[in-house]
């Protein structure tokens, strides 16, 4: 953002509005006109070295940014609120505004104030909005997280059948993806990508069926005119954007996909105004190509963020050993979208295995990778006119590192994925890389307007201009020496004043050498005669004077021209630069996962198309690292085998019982995380792992409510459980924890019981089901694929020791009172709880589970028959009658004691 000279504000003029006649300056009239075209954005109005905001924009911005709110002039009799931010710090303020959900229209001066004056004294400098800054269209380094993609997503929908598709684009890297979706998958597909901004047609935005999804997203949802999403116009829009005559090389897209592509491109053109970020060609993602993880599961497993929204404590943080921004983004992408093709998974695992087998070489690769800057984002900034010399320097630095990596890999026998990456690196534009090395100085300024970024010797005219600018005294002294030698006048001087500028001065006695001949007169032009001296100039000196006066401006002009030349060359090589950068990210992720595997003792999983799920000595990747950091006891590894018990059979279900604090939830989560890690192409925290590809992963772990939507914790649990039971199939993995705990005991037991039956008979999937309803363990007698396992504990001196070991069998207690004591409940409460528990256990009737088991046809309710009433014996009747006849309030202590002896005697006879 270049500094501009602020024009003098013209006098106010009459502006008769509908409310009342007011006097507005031409500048304020211009502001109001531009603001009227950008009502949904804060308007950054350029005035000299500041962006100023007025009216409601100023009030909102001053509050959001914590800057002073002042006033400037009046409108309709009221003071006009105003605030401003300096241009040089604009990115910092934009970052804060975007983070708070604002959109910003950047309005620049598009002509010099001197030009405006030529049109008249009251003319205002022309201004125009050059860009709309929105959450999904950021390119500035300060506004972006280097480890996180910044996706703009657009949703397309066709009339009639209502078919849906999604497009997501990161204009900071050029990534461009497209996929079809369905109404029931829409929310999950949006949250998998986690866009910064979602653009939808205004008709879809107000659709009653879709609106709940938009309300849930919690991101910036931007409705746009439906005409932008016209699938019929999409082909022309795509051809124009990519500057191609035909889309034959782009593949075939469905109508909803074309609608989404059209809306995304139209929005980019709208926000970037005259600039066109270079994008990759749209890449289609096919349904079923990645592991489906619904939003609730994604949140409960804390893949990219914890439940509180932090990156620390997430699985991504625990496994990230990347050293480049591109590598970090690729790792996050792989984690959030694991593969379902064993062949593709094996390609990634082969890369990690190779890196583990070539540790010395990989250490050298990682040293080179640490020097790789964010090339795609630097390229994007250059392409949209927001780049600087350091972005060109980033490309040069990246090329150098890529060259070093190519040299290290020369002759290496690489697995397929890494071999393809090496090939892309070797195809980087070597000529352009050499050009950058020749052109760019070693130390680069942040802004191109500062100059000094072109290497000395690259451009002779620039060197001359710099010499004139920086060494004018030496140049003048050199010319003076030339003239002394030419004329033989040793007292000749070149001097300067504000009237004549530069001139040659000689004494009157020595002036003959410059005036005696016609040749001398034409060479030395007389300027002024003094009492004792004469002054001359030459064509050469006059040109030099002009050059010196304009040297700084000319030097900067030459540098800016070179910058534009290099930028154009970079954009011309965009495809090969991005391909090389992507290849470097692949090497970064592969070596990082190898470092993780070596550091944490992970094993290579065997992934195939079977229904196997056999984890030996599995561990929770996040908890294990946390325990190591705390120097606590080592993590207790556990096996998990949900594989079919016979050939051709369905996956197994483990019913897990055990105490609170015993580690049930950790065990459930760790197996889900191991599946995700395996299918993203990572080694896993286990002794060994054989995993049949999971196509859908569902997890209902942990309790949370949704008060904003009027949902209790139990209601949220039931909604999520319903989604699992309605969608899980034989290749799915289901993790359920404490289903039914949020309601009355028998209600909860009934729901949990029926859910397990349904998973076993209808979904027929692999599942882990943790519960405190110990009656459910009886299900193993009738459900052939269900096994009981429990978390082992050891009781010692009225306390309980959690062993965190999973063993076959069933628990008969939950040790809740002991856990309450550990949590610090008052001793009186703990003691009373223990007494109540003993009384409840003593009065508990037996046989409930047996009655449920005997009633299996599936899903039927418990038989409504009552237990036969026991036959009352005569002696029992006599005792009962005696007790019934007692009036406790009328007995004296002596009578009460006698009565006790009598009742004891009757009881003995009975």
Curated annotation (Swiss-Prot):
<dbReference type="InterPro" id="IPR036187">
    <property type="entry name" value="DNA_mismatch_repair_MutS_sf"/>
</dbReference>
<feature type="binding site">
    <location>
        <begin position="658"/>
        <end position="665"/>
    </location>
    <ligand>
        <name>ATP</name>
    </ligand>
</feature>
<feature type="region of interest" description="Disordered">
    <location>
        <begin position="1"/>
        <end position="21"/>
    </location>
</feature>
<dbReference type="Pfam" id="PF05190">
    <property type="entry name" value="MutS_IV"/>
</dbReference>
<keyword id="KW-0067">ATP-binding</keyword>
<dbReference type="InterPro" id="IPR017261">
    <property type="entry name" value="DNA_mismatch_repair_MutS/MSH"/>
</dbReference>
<feature type="compositionally biased region" description="Basic and acidic residues">
    <location>
        <begin position="1"/>
        <end position="11"/>
    </location>
</feature>
<keyword id="KW-0238">DNA-binding</keyword>
<dbReference type="Pfam" id="PF00488">
    <property type="entry name" value="MutS_V"/>
</dbReference>
<keyword id="KW-0234">DNA repair</keyword>
<dbReference type="InterPro" id="IPR045076">
    <property type="entry name" value="MutS"/>
</dbReference>
<dbReference type="InterPro" id="IPR007861">
    <property type="entry name" value="DNA_mismatch_repair_MutS_clamp"/>
</dbReference>
<comment type="similarity">
    <text>Belongs to the DNA mismatch repair MutS family.</text>
</comment>
<dbReference type="InterPro" id="IPR005748">
    <property type="entry name" value="DNA_mismatch_repair_MutS"/>
</dbReference>
<dbReference type="Pfam" id="PF05188">
    <property type="entry name" value="MutS_II"/>
</dbReference>
<dbReference type="GO" id="GO:0006298">
    <property type="term" value="P:mismatch repair"/>
</dbReference>
<dbReference type="Pfam" id="PF05192">
    <property type="entry name" value="MutS_III"/>
</dbReference>
<dbReference type="GO" id="GO:0030983">
    <property type="term" value="F:mismatched DNA binding"/>
</dbReference>
<dbReference type="InterPro" id="IPR027417">
    <property type="entry name" value="P-loop_NTPase"/>
</dbReference>
<dbReference type="GO" id="GO:0005829">
    <property type="term" value="C:cytosol"/>
</dbReference>
<dbReference type="GO" id="GO:0140664">
    <property type="term" value="F:ATP-dependent DNA damage sensor activity"/>
</dbReference>
<keyword id="KW-0547">Nucleotide-binding</keyword>
<dbReference type="InterPro" id="IPR036678">
    <property type="entry name" value="MutS_con_dom_sf"/>
</dbReference>
<dbReference type="InterPro" id="IPR000432">
    <property type="entry name" value="DNA_mismatch_repair_MutS_C"/>
</dbReference>
<keyword id="KW-0227">DNA damage</keyword>
<dbReference type="GO" id="GO:0003684">
    <property type="term" value="F:damaged DNA binding"/>
</dbReference>
<dbReference type="InterPro" id="IPR007860">
    <property type="entry name" value="DNA_mmatch_repair_MutS_con_dom"/>
</dbReference>
<protein>
    <recommendedName>
        <fullName>DNA mismatch repair protein MutS</fullName>
    </recommendedName>
</protein>
<dbReference type="InterPro" id="IPR016151">
    <property type="entry name" value="DNA_mismatch_repair_MutS_N"/>
</dbReference>
<dbReference type="GO" id="GO:0005524">
    <property type="term" value="F:ATP binding"/>
</dbReference>
<dbReference type="Pfam" id="PF01624">
    <property type="entry name" value="MutS_I"/>
</dbReference>
<comment type="function">
    <text>This protein is involved in the repair of mismatches in DNA. It is possible that it carries out the mismatch recognition step. This protein has a weak ATPase activity.</text>
</comment>
<dbReference type="InterPro" id="IPR007695">
    <property type="entry name" value="DNA_mismatch_repair_MutS-lik_N"/>
</dbReference>
<dbReference type="InterPro" id="IPR007696">
    <property type="entry name" value="DNA_mismatch_repair_MutS_core"/>
</dbReference>
């Amino acid at each position: 953002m270049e500094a501009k000279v602020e024009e003098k504000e013209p006098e106010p003029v009459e502006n008769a509005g509908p409310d009342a006649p007011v006097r507005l300056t031409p500048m304020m009239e211009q502001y109001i006109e531009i603001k009227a075209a950008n009502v949904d954005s804060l308007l950054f109005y350029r005035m000299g070295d500041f962006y100023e905001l007025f009216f409601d924009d100023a009030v909102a911005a001053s509050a959001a940014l914590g800057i002073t709110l002042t006033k400037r002039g009046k409108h309709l009799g009221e003071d006009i609120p105003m605030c401003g931010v300096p241009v040089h710090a604009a990115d910092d303020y934009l970052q804060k505004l975007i983070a708070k959900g604002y959109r910003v229209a950047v309005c620049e001066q598009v002509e010099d104030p001197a030009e405006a004056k030529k049109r008249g004294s009251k003319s205002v400098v022309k201004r125009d909005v050059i860009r709309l800054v929105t959450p999904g269209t950021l390119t500035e380094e300060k506004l972006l997280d280097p480890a996180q993609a910044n996706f703009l997503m657009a949703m397309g929908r066709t009339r009639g059948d209502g078919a849906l598709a999604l497009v997501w684009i990161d204009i900071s890297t050029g990534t461009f993806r497209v996929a079809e979706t369905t109404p029931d998958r829409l929310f999950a597909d949006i949250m998998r990508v986690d866009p910064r901004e979602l653009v939808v047609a205004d008709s879809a935005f107000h659709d009653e069926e879709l609106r709940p999804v938009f309300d849930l997203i919690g991101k910036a949802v931007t409705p746009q005119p439906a005409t932008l999403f016209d699938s019929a116009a999409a082909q022309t829009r795509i051809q124009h954007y990519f500057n191609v005559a035909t889309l034959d090389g782009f593949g075939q897209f469905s109508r909803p996909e074309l609608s989404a592509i059209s809306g995304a491109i139209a929005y980019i053109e709208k926000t970037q105004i005259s600039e066109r970020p270079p994008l990759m060609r749209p890449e289609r993602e096919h349904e079923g190509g990645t592991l489906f993880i619904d939003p609730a599961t994604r949140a409960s497993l804390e893949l990219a963020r914890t439940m509180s929204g932090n990156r620390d404590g997430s699985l991504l943080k625990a496994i990230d050993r990347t050293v480049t921004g591109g590598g970090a983004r690729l790792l996050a992408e792989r984690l959030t979208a694991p593969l379902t093709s064993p062949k593709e998974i094996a390609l990634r695992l082969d890369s990690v295995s190779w890196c583990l087998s070539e540790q010395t070489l990989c250490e050298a690769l990682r040293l080179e990778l640490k020097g790789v800057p964010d090339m795609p984002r630097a390229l994007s900034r250059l392409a949209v006119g927001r780049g600087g010399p350091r972005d060109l320097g980033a490309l040069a630095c990246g090329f150098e590192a890529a060259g070093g990596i190519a040299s290290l890999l020369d002759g290496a026998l690489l697995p397929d994925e890494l071999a393809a990456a090496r090939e892309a690196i070797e195809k980087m534009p070597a000529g352009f890389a050499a050009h950058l090395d020749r052109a760019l100085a070693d130390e680069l300024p942040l802004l191109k307007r500062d100059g000094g970024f072109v290497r000395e010797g690259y451009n002779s005219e620039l060197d001359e201009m710099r010499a004139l600018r920086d060494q004018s005294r030496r140049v003048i002294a050199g010319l003076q020496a030339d003239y002394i030698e030419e004329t033989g006048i040793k007292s000749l001087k070149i001097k300067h004043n504000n009237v004549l500028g530069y001139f040659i001065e000689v004494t009157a006695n020595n002036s003959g050498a410059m005036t005696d001949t016609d040749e001398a007169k034409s060479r030395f032009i007389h300027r002024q005669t003094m009492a004792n001296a004469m002054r001359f100039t030459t064509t050469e000196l006059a040109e030099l004077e002009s050059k010196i006066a304009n040297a700084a401006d000319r030097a900067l002009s030459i540098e800016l021209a070179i910058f534009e030349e290099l930028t154009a060359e970079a954009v011309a090589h965009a495809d090969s630069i991005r391909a090389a950068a992507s290849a470097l990210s692949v090497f970064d992720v592969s070596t990082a996962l190898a470092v993780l595997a070596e550091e944490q003792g992970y094993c290579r999983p065997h992934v195939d198309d079977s229904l196997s799920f056999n984890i030996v000595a599995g561990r929770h990747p996040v908890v294990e690292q946390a325990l190591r950091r705390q120097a606590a006891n080592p993590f207790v590894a556990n096996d998990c085998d949900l594989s079919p018990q016979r050939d051709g059979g369905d996956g197994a279900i483990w019913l897990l019982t055990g105490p609170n604090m015993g580690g049930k939830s950790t065990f459930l989560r760790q197996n889900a995380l191991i599946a995700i890690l395996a299918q993203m192409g990572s080694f896993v925290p286990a002794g060994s792992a054989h995993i049949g590809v999971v196509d859908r992963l569902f997890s209902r772990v942990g309790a949370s409510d949704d008060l904003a939507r009027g949902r209790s914790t139990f209601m949220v649990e039931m909604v999520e459980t319903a989604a699992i039971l309605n969608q899980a199939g034989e290749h799915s993995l289901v993790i359920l924890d404490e289903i039914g705990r949020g309601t009355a005991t028998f209600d909860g037991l009934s729901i949990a019981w029926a859910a397990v039956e349904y998973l076993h008979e209808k979904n027929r999937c692999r599942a882990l089901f943790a519960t405190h309803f110990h009656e459910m363990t009886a299900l193993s007698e009738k459900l052939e694929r269900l096994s009981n396992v429990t978390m082992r504990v050891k009781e010692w001196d009225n306390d309980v020791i959690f062993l965190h070991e999973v063993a076959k069998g069933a628990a008969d207690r939950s040790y809740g009172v002991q856990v309450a004591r550990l949590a610090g409940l008052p001793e009186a409460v703990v003691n009373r709880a223990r007494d109540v528990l003993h009384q409840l256990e003593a009065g508990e009737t037996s046989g409930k589970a047996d009655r449920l088991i005997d009633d299996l046809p599936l899903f039927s309710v418990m038989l409504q028959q009552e237990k036969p009433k026991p036959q009352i014996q005569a002696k029992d009747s006599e005792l009962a009658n005696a007790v019934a006849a007692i009036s406790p309030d009328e007995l004296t202590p002596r009578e009460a004691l006698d009565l006790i002896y009598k009742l004891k005697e009757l009881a003995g006879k009975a």
